[in-house]
């Protein structure tokens, strides 16, 4: 089950039994998108609350520059050494929300809830024309579980203003 899956009509961001998919599983699933929508007000509030916890984790204030936030996330991930599933999932939500909000603020991307034909849903930040996206919670989870290398800063710096017209929610990771 994915990070925010279990109701076809509502995207719940947190649930004790939900864990993010590994990023390679998410890539396979991106071709199965059946519906997507901008996040609602409740989801926005929850993402912002989780991002605020992420800022506390890395010891920064909301006014911090994007580069400082990225350095903080990268350093936190490099030093993270827990194998506790609940702690890993919590950190994925917090740092994933912080990364997504940082991408949103810096590049003008927007948060979306995406539903797949598997009855699962997840949150991502997507480019203005919805051609590219980053499933930030899943991405951070894959780093915390050592399934993906920590290239947070590289990913952030490779984001472009525009992507090929044939792309639709192409997953960046």
Each language-model region and where it sits:
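Amphipathic protein-protein interaction modules
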Residues: 91-145
């Amino acid at each position: 089950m994915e990070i925010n899956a279990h109701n076809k009509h509502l995207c719940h961001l947190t649930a004790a039994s939900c864990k993010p998919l590994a990023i390679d599983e998410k890539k396979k699933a991106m071709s199965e998108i059946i519906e997507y929508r901008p996040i609602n007000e409740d989801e926005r509030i929850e993402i912002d609350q989780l991002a605020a916890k992420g800022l506390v984790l890395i010891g920064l204030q909301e006014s911090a520059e994007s580069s400082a936030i990225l350095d903080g996330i990268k350093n936190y991930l490099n030093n993270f050494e827990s194998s506790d599933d609940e702690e890993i999932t919590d950190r994925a939500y917090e740092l994933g929300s912080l990364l997504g909000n940082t991408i949103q603020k810096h590049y003008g991307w927007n948060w979306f809830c995406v539903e797949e034909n598997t009855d699962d849903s997840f949150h991502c930040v997507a480019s203005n024309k919805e051609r590219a996206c980053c499933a930030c919670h899943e991405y951070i989870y894959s780093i915390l579980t050592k399934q993906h290398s920590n290239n947070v800063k590289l990913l952030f710096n490779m984001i472009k203003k525009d992507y090929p017209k044939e792309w639709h929610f192409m997953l960046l990771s």
